[in-house]
Amino acid sequence: ANYSNAHGTPWVYKHQQIGRLVGMPVPGTMTTVSWETLQDPTLIFGTPITGYRLSDGSYLENTQLEPDVKVANSPETVVKGEDTQLRTAVQELLKEIDKK
């Protein structure tokens, strides 16, 4: 599952044009959450307290981040210890090197 900085970190990476994103879309979940424990310490809940805005005033919350190269890891390959997303990311980097 992707949440919060699993959205914020790749968003900054793409927004700053540091490189290309490889993987699957990330739901827009970029807020700061305050975690509270109730009287029963097994009950914990999070309350969003800060939303992150772009220069145009729109919020990152509910704004899905799309990768440049969309590729999923299937359960069948994951149980074999294979990472299709990582392999694709390395292939994309090698293409960039070959261009130079």
Residue ranges and their predicted role:
Residues 1-100:
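C-terminal "post-core" interaction segments
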